[in-house]
Design a protein with these regions (language model features):
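Short amphipathic alpha-helical interaction patches enriched in hydrophobic/aromatic residues
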Residues: 11, 50-54, 75, 95, ...
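Short, conserved catalytic or adaptor-binding loops enriched in Gly and charged residues
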Residues: 26-31, 69-73, 135-141
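Helix-adjacent hinge/juxtasegments
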Residues: 56-83
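Short, well-structured N-terminal submotif of metal-dependent ribonuclease cores
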Residues: 1-41, 53-66
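Short, flexible helix/strand-to-coil boundary loops that buttress conserved ligand/catalytic motifs
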Residues: 14-15, 50, 128-129
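Active-site neighborhoods of divalent-metal-dependent phosphate/nucleic-acid chemistry enzymes
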Residues: 76-122, 126
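Amphipathic alpha-helical repeat scaffolds of TPR domains
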Residues: 44-48
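Acidic, PIN/NYN-like endoribonuclease modules and their adjacent C-terminal/linker elements
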Residues: 80, 111, 115-153
C-alpha cells in the first residue's frame, strides 16, 4: 500500500520521542512492503518542533538538522510537494472540516497520491464518519483510508 505518514512518525528522526509511537515506525511499515510518502509541509513541521526543543536546550541544533537531512535525502520516502493545484484545491475544501490547515495539506496529499493516511490525530480520525468528507472521497479517491499505525501494522 502507498501510505502517507503524518509528521508524528517522523519526529523521532530529529530526536523527539512521541508516547506510544515506536521510533522505527517507518522502518516497520517498509518491512511490511508498504511504500512510504510524506508531505513537504512535514519538513516545516519538523523544523518548527525542532526549533522549540533547540530553543529550550533540550536538543542540540545539529541533531535536528541531521535528522531533517536524513529524511529529505532518504530515497525510500517519497515526498509530495504542497504546491500542486489539485492538492491545494482539495486542501481548501478540507479546511471547512479541519481547523489546522497543515493537517488539510497532509490529508490532501494522502488523498491525492496514496491509499491511506497514517495518523493518530483525533480530528482527522473523526473525519471517517463525516458525511461531507465521505462525499469528497467518493469523487477524489473512493478506496482511501485513514488509519492509525496499529491498524497498518
Amino acid at each position: 500500500m502507498k501510505l502517507l505518514l503524518d509528521t508524528t512518525y517522523l519526529l523521532p528522526a530529529i530526536g523527539i520521542s512521541v508516547k506510544n509511537v515506536p521510533k522505527d515506525a517507518p522502518i516497520k511499515l517498509l518491512r511490511k512492503g508498504h511504500t512510504i510518502f510524506m508531505s513537504d509541509i512535514s519538513i516545516f513541521e519538523l523544523s518548527a518542533n525542532g526549533a522549540k526543543y533547540v530553543a529550550t536546550g533540550k536538543l542540540p541544533a545539529e541533531r535536528v538538522t541531521r535528522g531533517i537531512r536524513a529524511i529529505v535525502y532518504n530515497e525510500t520516502i517519497e515526498k509530495i510537494p504542497i504546491h500542486d493545484t489539485t492538492l491545494l484545491l482539495t486542501a481548501f475544501k478540507l479546511r471547512s472540516l479541519l481547523s489546522d490547515f497543515i493537517d488539510c495539506l497532509i490529508l490532501s496529499a494522502a488523498i491525492d497520491k496514496c491509499d491511506a493516511l497514517i495518523t493518530e490525530d483525533q480530528d482527522i480520525q473523526n473525519l471517517k464518519e463525516n458525511k461531507e468528507f465521505k462525499g469528497l472521497l467518493s469523487s477524489a479517491n473512493p478506496s482511501f483510508k485513514i488509519q492509525t499505525l496499529k491498524e497498518s501494522l
